[in-house]
Amino acid sequence: MELNIQTIPGYKTNQYLLVLNPHEELRNRIMQVKREFYDVYKAPTAIGGKPRVALITFTQFEMMEERIINRLKMVAMGYHPFKVELKDFGSFPSHTIFINITTKEPIRALVKEMKVAQRLMKLNDDFKPHFIDEPHLTIARKLLPWQYEQGWKEYSKKHFSARFIADSMLLLKRREGNRAYQIVQRFEFMNLPVITKQGELFM
C-alpha cells in the first residue's frame, strides 16, 4: 500500500514564498494598476496576486520550517536596508507583464546571500528552491496570447514611477491546493556583523 506522505504527522509540505513587501500606500497604487488591467483584459492573476517582489519560492516539509527561519534570520541580520526603484513596465514574452525594478543589484545580492540555505529549502530532486534572478513586480502572469499582445501594446507605452525602502523581508506559506498565503515571519535587515559564510550554515 502506498503511503501518502502528506498524512504523516510532521511530514506535511508547504509552498513557501520569500518576498519584499512595499509600504501600504504603494501596495494600494499597484493594486489599482492591477485592477485596471483586469477590468480591460480579464486576467484573473491581475487581481489574484498581491503586490510584492518575489525573492525565492520553494516547497518543503513543515518540520524544516524552524531551521529555515533561523537561517533566514541570520542572513537578514547581516543585510542592510536598501532603496527599491520602480519605473514603467516590462514583460516576459508571452505570458507576463510587470513593473520594472531599476535597482536590481541589491536584490540580486540579497538572493545570492540566501543561496547558502538552499540545502534546507530543497525537498528532493523534483522540488528544488527557485531563486529569482530577474527581480520584478508582477501585474499579471499566465496571460493568454491575446491578453499579452494587447496588454503589452498598451502597457509598453504607459508610465509608472515609485520607490520604497526595503527594510525587511517576509516569509509566506500555503498548503498545497490553497490559494492564499499566510505570513510565517518578518525578518528585519539590521546590518549587523553576522558570520554567514558558506560551510558554517549547514548546521
Regions found by a protein language model. Give the residues of each.
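Basic, often amphipathic N-terminal segments
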Residues: 1-83, 106-163, 180-203
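Short, basic/glycine-rich phosphate-binding loops at helix/coil junctions
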Residues: 90-96
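Short histidine-centered catalytic/ligand-binding loop motif
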Residues: 97-103
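Residue-level signal for short segments within beta-strands and strand-turn junctions
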Residues: 173-175
